[in-house]
Amino acid sequence: MPASPLPALSPPASPRRNTSGASALGSRKADIPPDAIRGFATVGSLVRSEHFAQHFDDDIAGKDQEQSRKKSPEDVGNIAATKKKPGKRAATTSTADGEAKPKPKPRARKPKAADEEAVIIDPELRLPAAKVSPFFAAEGAPAAIEPSDEPVVDVPKLTKAGKPRKPRAKKENVGGEEAVPKPKRTRVTKPKAAKAKAGGKSQEEACVESAHFRKSEDTGDETVAGVLATRKSATTENVGSGEASIWDVPQSPKPKKKRAPKKPPPDPVINNLELDEAVSRRRDWTPPRDTAIPSPFTDSVGKENKQIEPDADNGGFTHMISNFAYAQALPAQVASTVADSATGTMAATKRRRIELLDVPGNQTTSRNSSPEKGKAPKKKPRTITDIATEQYQHRAAQLDQSDVASDFFQSHTAVTKVPLNDASLPNGDAPTKKPPRKRSTSKPASEKEKVGSKARSKKASTKAAAKPKHIAEKLLSPGSALMRMNKQDILFGTSSQLALEEPPTLVRQLQHALKESEVEADLSSNGMIAPPPRWPKLDKVVGKRSLWDASSRDVEGGMLEHMEDVYIPEFDRTQDFPLLMDGTNDQPDGAPPSFADIDDFEPAPPVIISSDGPTPPPTTSRTSQRKANDEPDHVMEGPVFEDIDDFDFQPPPSNQNVEFQDSFADDDEILHTSVQSSTHPPPRLRPPATSDPMNGSSKKPRGCPAKSQSAIATSGSPAVAKEPKRTKGKEVKSAPAPPTTPAKGSGRFIDIDEILDSDDEALQALSPTPPRIHNFENSQPLPLYSVSPTRAKKPKADSSVDSKIVPVHIIPTAHLEWLNLKNSIFPSITSHIRSLPSTRDPSKPSWHEKILMYDPIVLEDFTAYLNAKTSLRTWRRATKIQSKAWNKAQKSIGAQEIGVVEGGGNVLAVEKELEAWQVQSWCESMSVCCIWGEGRGKGGVRKGFY
C-alpha cells in the first residue's frame, strides 16, 4: 500500500489549504486552540524526531487501511492533538517510513478505552487541540501515519503536564484494535472532533454526526463521524480506501461550509416562502419606502406602506382614516398569527414572512390605488376658505351619510366621514366596490375581502378626492346652494374666525344676540327711532349706527338733527342782525323797529316824561337809575336800553347837539351808577335826596359833569356844578341836526367815541371804552423789576446825605445766602428779559432775541446789564465802618440810627450787585447758552459753553 500514500502526498497539500480555512473557523470558536497549538507543537517535535523513524520500519500497509476505516477517528484525534503544527514535518518522514507507526498506535488505543469515562472532563481541552491539529494533519497525512506509533507512548506524559491528555483518552478508546490507522486519523478527523468538544454546541453536533457516521461505518468513532457526516462524499471515500479516504477527510473546511447549510435547516419554511431572497431585497427597499409614505405614486413601495398611504388620504377625508385604520389592525394581527404558524427560526425571516403574507394581498390593491392616491394629495392642500366652508358641508354630508348606509360609518365616526359618502355617490360605476369597502372595515370579513375592499376603497377614495376638489358635491350643487342661501344666513368674517372648529350656528346665534341687544339699546335711547330699523335691510344699517352710538351716545340721529335744526336758524338770525345794523347805519328810521321790539316796553315812560318838560325826563331817568341801584338786577337791563332808545330816537351829531351829549351823559350816569351800585353802597343814600322831581331835575344837570367827580369823590357835594352843565345840555338838545351823523356813516359807535373824547376824566375813571392812545400817553411804564419784599425800607435820606455813603439795611440773616435769594431773583430776571421790546436794528438784538437765537450770552456783559438796568441786588454783611458812617449820616439828618441785637435773627447788610456766577446759574436753569468772557472767568469762552 505504499503506492497509495505516495500519490496521496499531492492531495494533502490541498486539504491542508482547506484545513487552514477550517482552522480560521476553529479560531473563531474559542481561545483554547492557541493553547493546544503550543502544547502539541512540542509533542510533534519529539514524536517526529523519534517515533516516526521507528514506526515507519513496521509494515503498516494493510493495517493502515483497516484502521483508517474503523478506528481512524479516535486515533486521529489522539495523534492530531499531539501533532498539530509538526504534522507538516512528519509528512516527509511518513513517506519514507510508511509502516513503522501502526504498532505503537494500538498501545495508545488501550489507554483510551480506560480513559473514556474521564473524557467528559477532558473533552473541552481536547476540542481546542483538535481544532488546531486538523490543519497540520491534513497537510502531512501519510507522514502522520508512521510517526504516531512510538510517540503515542510519549504523548501521555506530555498530556499529563498539559492539555494533550485528550489524545491519550482517544488512544484508549481505540483499544487494541489496530494501531496503524491512527496516523490516518490524526491527519484529518482529530481536529474536528476536538472542535466539537471544545464548545458545547460543537460536541453535540459531533455526537449527532457520529451516529450518522456509525450508520455508515461500524467503527463508531464520534470525532471523525462528526466531520465526515457533514460531508458524505468524504465518508464514502474513507470507506473505499484507507489512505484515499483519509486524504478526502482533511477537506474538513467543507463541513464548515455545511454550517451555511445548517442555516438551511429551516429550508422547509424557505421552500414554502420561495421568494425570501427577492422579498429580502424588497424588504431592504421598504424602509426608504416607509419614509416616503406621503408619496402614494410609487408602486414598488411596501404593501403595508401603501396601506398607510390610503390612511393618510383618509386622514384628509376623515372617513377613509377610520376605515383603513380598522382594516390595518386586522391584517396586522392575522399576519402575526400566520408568522407564528410559519415558525421561522430567524426573527428576520419571520418579519419577511409577515411582509410576504401582507404584501401579496395588498400589492394588487396598492398598485391599483397608487395612481388614484396621486389625486388625493391634490385634494390635501386646503386653503383657509376650504376649512371655513367645511362647516357648511357637514350638514349636507350628514344627509349623504344617511343615504349611503351610514350605520357602519356612524359606528366608527359620525360627521367626519361626510367626504367619503360624497365620494361614494359620484362613483356610480363601482357601487359594487363600495360594499366590499364596508366589509373590509368590518372585522368579521375575510382577509381576501379586506384586500379587495381596500383596493376598491382606495379607488373610491381617490375618486371622492377628485370631486371634492371641484367642491360641487361638498358645497352642494348651485341650485341647492341657492336654496340654502335662502334658508340660512351667510357668515362674513375673517378666515381665522370662520376656520374655527365651532359650528356656524353658534356664530349666527352670537350675531343675532348682538343685533337684538343693539335694537334694545336703540329702543331704550330713542323709542321713536328704534321701530323703523326693524325692517330687514334697515336692521343691518341700524347695527352700524349703533356702533356710532356706542362710541358717542349723544351723536344719534335724533340728537344730531335737533342740534342742527337749532344751529341753522341761528345762522339765519345772525345774518339778519348785521343787516339790521347796516340799516340803522344807513337809515335811522329803519333801525329802531328792531330795537323797538326789545326796548319799547321800557322806553315809553321816559318819552312821556320828556314830553312834559325838558328837565323832568333826565330826572326820571336819574330816579329810575337810582331805583335800579336799589334793585341791581334791573339796573343793567332796563335803564341802559331806555337811554339807548332815547339816543336812537334822537340821533343828532355829537358835536352840534348838546342834548345828545346829555342823553349820552345819562347813559354814562347809568353805567356809573351800575358800577357804583355793584361796588359801593352809597348810591342807595342818593334816592331820598332825589325823591322830589324838581330837586332831582336841578341836580340832574349838575350830576352830568359832576358824575365823574361823584365817581371819584363824594356824590352829594358837587350838586351846584352839575346844574349849569345840565342846562347847557338841554339848550343843545333844542337844536337838532340828525342828518350829520348818517352823513358820517360812523353809526352809534363813532358817536360814543366822540362823546367819550369830550369827557376824558370821567371816561378814564369809569368806562373801559376810552381810546387807549390817551391812556398810554398819560400812563407811565410799569417797573421792569420787582423789589424784593424782604428788603428793608430805606429811610428817606435828604439831599444833604453824601452819596458816597453806602446805605445799610436790616435784613434777616438767611438772606445773606444765595440759595435763599435765587428763588426770588430768578423770576425777576426772567420777567425783565421777556419784557424787553424787540430791537429795530438786526445788528443789535436785545438780550431776549439773543437768547431765542441761541446766541451765546457773555456772562460779564449780561451781568453788567442786569446791574445797570434793574434793581436786583444781593446782600452782604455791612462792616462796622459802613454801619458807623451810615448812622452818622442819619444823625446829621435827624433820622433814627440803625442797630441790631445780636442773636435776634437780623443783620446789618449792604446791597451787592449780581455776580456773573449767579447769572450763570440762572442761565443754566433756563437752558440759556452762556459763556465767560474771553481771557476771564474759568478758562475762557470755549470752556464756558452750556
Swiss-Prot record:
Oligomer status and interactors: Forms a heterodimer with SLX1.
Post-translational events: Phosphorylated in response to DNA damage.
Record's function text: Regulatory subunit of the SLX1-SLX4 structure-specific endonuclease that resolves DNA secondary structures generated during DNA repair and recombination. Has endonuclease activity towards branched DNA substrates, introducing single-strand cuts in duplex DNA close to junctions with ss-DNA.
Predominant location category: nucleus
Protein name, as recorded: Structure-specific endonuclease subunit SLX4
Organism: Phaeosphaeria nodorum (strain SN15 / ATCC MYA-4574 / FGSC 10173)
Molecular-function annotations in GO: 5'-flap endonuclease activity
Basic and acidic residues bias (residue ranges): 54-74, 278-287, 627-636, 722-733
Entry GO CC: Slx1-Slx4 complex
Compositional bias of kind Basic residues: 160-169, 182-195, 453-469
A Pfam short name: Slx4
Compositionally biased tracts (Pro residues): 1-14
Subcellular localization(s) per the UniProt record: Nucleus
Family: Belongs to the SLX4 family.
